[in-house]
Amino acid sequence: MSGPLVIGHRGASGHRPEHTAAAYRLAWRSGADSVEPDVVATRDGVLVCRHDLELSRTTDVADHPELAHLRRRQVVDGQVEEGWFVHDLDLDQLRTLRARERWPRRRRRSAAFDDRLPILTLAELLELREQESARAGRALGVHVELKHGAHLAGLGLPLVEPLVDLLRQHRLTTALAPLTVMAFEADLLRGLRREVDVDLVQLVDKHQTKALRRGRLHKVGEYATGVGLHKQLALPRDAEGRSTGPGPAVERVQSRGLDVLVWTLRDENRYLPTELQVPGPSRRHGHADREVQALLALGVDGLLCDHPETAVEVISRRTAAVAV
């Protein structure tokens, strides 16, 4: 990994419904180096770009009477959920759906694209990457995140094997490939390491501080090339939501020879530390550029952003200042 990468989180998901071709395309065309698709499997084993297994928050599935019989309640990763699930639909059924904005009140401009954009398969995204790379004149990246791996494997829908097949088809299996795979589930990454040489990133949530102990990081280094930190591990906050200064996580991970990605940067007040918020509603954009600056000062290797243009602009200004 060279330099601070800007990664469009679920595409430019601050501007278009997440995980759609429009969101990914906009991220790349806004200057992002890579995009991040979450990946799960359909009933017939096709890898598709969705964050949640349950579909009603981000698609129009509830408006499809022909699918009403598939609504059910089930436990997913320890949580009871009710609705329509990706793994209960085959690809043909999923293709009848259209994407919707996850937070329509907060992201009204994105919600204007509701019910227009189809669900994308991972294969289609990899093809789109090739097209956009040719257009941009540079190798654009993809940071695949595998979701709900154990749950899907228990249903006979493993993620690793079909992913490896896709990577081989697209010649994206070497350490130099513009593709990274991320996951919270270490077993998924270990399985991939036996098959491909691409960069692998172990994700760590803000409450998983034990994962940052030196012994644990040594084990991560046996299969991964990087760690993806929740941004509050890099820049902790107090009980009032104010930043308390840099935490030790970035230095600790990098001291083990591992790259550091940070997730997820969002420009709205709701997601910023108190001191970077501006007067107005939670959906109003605050001083997100200052959060980017603080993370770059820590020397992070990549940023996952819903509004990638913000990080692109900060990095461009920073690069220009150094060149003077």
What are these regions (language model features)?
Residues M1-V324:
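Phosphate-group recognition and catalysis centered on beta-loop-alpha active-site segments
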